[in-house]
Amino acid sequence: MPAKKLGDPYKPHRSSIMMITEWKQRMMESIAMDDDISKLLYYNTPDALSRSPLTEDQKIQLASFDPDGDRRRIYPTRYTPNVVMDQRSFIGLGISGFVPQESWRQFSEKYVMGYLYFYILVDNSIMEIDEGQRQDLLLQRIYDLFQDSYDYGMGHIQEGNLTELWEQNNKFGGYALMMRVIDFK
């Protein structure tokens, strides 16, 4: 009697670890499509928010790979791939710290808690805008877009921490916003 052929034993996981690329892409798209954020990133002038809205193509360029690095302002990593010499604003993303939630409880083997990071950096020579500080307004819009969102993980995203951030010998300043997400292991 011939042996019975077994099915493929591999079952793809459906966990937050498997969703990192998709989450980052969705976060970058949400950020780029926001009218205020896109204007604050695209226009380096004090009147950025009163300028005309960007076209959809211009918004897409803010989050798309650009070998020259001239148009991209939203990155799936904390750092930009090139040294920045121009006056610009950036938003970088990070995902980290996924650990079993409340390891002392019985249900912890099914859930993990981790953090989504938003790194907001603005050249210190273009921080001042007509409505206040560019980095503060970027922070407010990102917080508003993602706080209590149900688009990532199994629950809603909550603020976890906010830290001031300075890079490149204080040429760029801004914030590191950490938001907590809970998902299946």
Predicted stretch roles:
Residues 13, 17, 128-133:
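Short, charged/polar micro-motifs that form catalytic or ligand-binding hotspots
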Residues 84, 103-111, 168-172:
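Short, solvent-exposed beta-strand/turn "edge" segments of beta-rich domains on protein surfaces
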Residues 89, 133-185:
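Acidic-leaning, charged glycine-interspersed low-complexity segments
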Residues 1-104:
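Small/polar-rich, solvent-exposed N-terminal microdomains that initiate assembly or binding
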Residues 100-106, 123-128, 184-185:
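Short, cysteine-centered beta-strand-loop-beta hairpins and adjacent loop/turn segments enriched
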Residues 91, 114-118, 175-177:
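Hydrophobic residues positioned within well-ordered beta-strands of beta-sheet architectures
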Residues 111-128:
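Short acidic, glycine/tyrosine-flanked loop/strand segments centered on an H-E-D-like triad
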Residues 106-113, 130-139:
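"Short basic amphipathic alpha-helical interaction patches in structured regions
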